[in-house]
Amino acid sequence: MRTLARHSVKRTGGILKALTMMAAIVLCLSLLSEPAYGTESKPESIGLRNAADEKQVTSVKDAEAEHRSPYNAFIDDYESFEVTSSSLHDGVWDNIISNTDKGSNKSPQLEWTAVDGAGLYVIIMDDPTAMDWMHWKSDHVTETSLDEGWASSSEYVGPYPPGGSTHTYEIYVVALKAPVERVKGAFNGQNPKFEKNFQALDIDADGNSGNILAVGRISGTFSN
């Protein structure tokens, strides 16, 4: 009888031990199937991360758009005036102004109304598509109507984008009170400091600021 009792106790203990282990396993499985503590904020964290990613993508797109944009926004800081050209049709520059086999490398015809107080004008043609490549740089301009081919070859070189491409060419007519020491920037070369060099026109040769009265702008594309 005692032997049977001992076997019964051992068997009961084994059953209890097995049940305890099973309960522990069930508890572990239930914990694994439930969200961990603090994960209630996970959807919000994902949302914030997605928002941040979206913002980053937007910033990249904005930067790319800014890089592609032919328009230098800082020009808006100045008063403006209208510039017209008979060398521009439907937003496209005529072949004659280009430095290609189908052009004559003649500077575009330009015309504008005189700006009050302006002693002279500076003319710049910029290709923002090619790191602000400067195609035209004339200073001490006193006329307000320039014929096609007015600029010399030392001041003007027409558009010559790579074959199969389209570039934008912007002409700025800057009305100044007085002459500047020099118009900065590489003619027929890249100008990574285009904005800084442009703003330098606001200081005259005597060091006086506020030299830029207004800026006229005309823009068009050319394809090769």
Regions found by a protein language model. Name each.
Residues 19-30:
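Bacterial N-terminal signal peptides
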Residues 6, 28-31, 39:
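Intrinsically disordered, low-complexity segments
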Residues 35-224:
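N-terminus-centered regions that define maturation/targeting leaders and the start
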Residues 3-5, 20, 36:
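Ala/Thr-enriched low-complexity intrinsically disordered regions
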Residues 10, 32-35:
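Serine/proline-rich low-complexity intrinsically disordered segments, especially terminal tails, linkers
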Residues 1-14:
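N-terminal secretory signal peptides that target proteins for export/translocation
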